[in-house]
Design a protein with these regions (language model features):
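Bacterial N-terminal signal peptides
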Residues: 7-16
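Short active-site-adjacent helix-start/loop capping segments
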Residues: 42, 78-81, 106-109
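Positively charged n-region of N-terminal signal peptides that target proteins for export
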Residues: 1-4
Length: 228
């Protein structure tokens, strides 16, 4: 309820925030905010090498001025953590473009699929309340970390790929229900099995090279979402 109240309060003062943003960045600029976990802050590389940072620079280079105004993502965070800690900051940032990439830690922590669906749906709906253009929420699904050297340690008797695929199905269904574009990162992430340069030194997270390849996959969907 705290996050809902925060969003509603900020919605009331939204016109003022929008005016300030327009004054600072120009009316045609994109204010990009991120809701995510370790994959969105570039764990295994640096935040500057994370795919959201790369995406903001790529969009700007392509002619669409983009400012990464908020990325409070944290390693280990679940959808519950994002609702409690990231959503208020997302609302305060007053973005007009956003990406959402969450779910891996829900699965690791044995969150029930129905609970994950409910929390994910809440996140999507609250983010959409903030965005002026509802097609500008881009969803990225969960990569397959089971193919990394350290990934199997998190199985605990479960089949990781199958479990993540099940959560990705939920993500796809909730995105489709709201007419949101979805980038499927799962197949390209499986290249970490055979390409050691795609795995960070921790043996679990993607390397800077991998994040660069992910961004190349995400960029066309982001560019399409930003078209008038």
């Amino acid at each position: 309820m705290r996050s809902i109240s925060t969003c509603l309060i900020l919605a009331v003062v939204g016109l003022t925030a929008e005016s300030m943003a327009a004054s600072n960045f120009g009316e045609s600029s994109i204010r990009y905010a991120v809701v995510g976990d370790s994959y969105s802050i570039g764990e295994g590389a640096t935040e500057d090498e994370a795919w959201p940072a790369l995406l903001a620079r790529h969009l700007t280079k392509s002619g669409q001025a983009t400012e990464l105004v908020s990325n409070p993502s944290r390693t280990g965070w679940t959808t519950k953590d994002a609702i409690e800690n990231e959503l208020p900051l997302f609302c305060a940032a007053r973005p007009n473009f956003a990406t959402l990439m969450l779910g891996v830690n829900d699965w690791v922590q044995d969150v029930e699929p129905a609970t994950f669906r409910s929390r994910l749906a809440h996140l999507m709906d609250e983010m959409l309340k903030v965005l002026p253009n509802k097609k500008r929420l881009l969803v990225v699904n969960i990569p397959d970390f089971s193919v990394t050297p350290e990934g199997p340690k998190y199985a605990r008797g479960r089949v990781i790929s199958a479990g993540l695929a099940g959560f990705n199905k939920i993500i796809a269904e909730e995105a489709q229900r709201r007419g949101l574009a979805l980038v499927d990162i799962f197949p390209i992430s499986q290249q970490m099995r055979d390409r050691s340069e795609l795995v960070a030194t921790d043996g679990l997270h993607p390397s800077a090279t991998a994040y660069t390849e992910w961004e190349a996959l995400i960029f066309p969907a982001a560019r399409a979402a930003l078209e008038p």
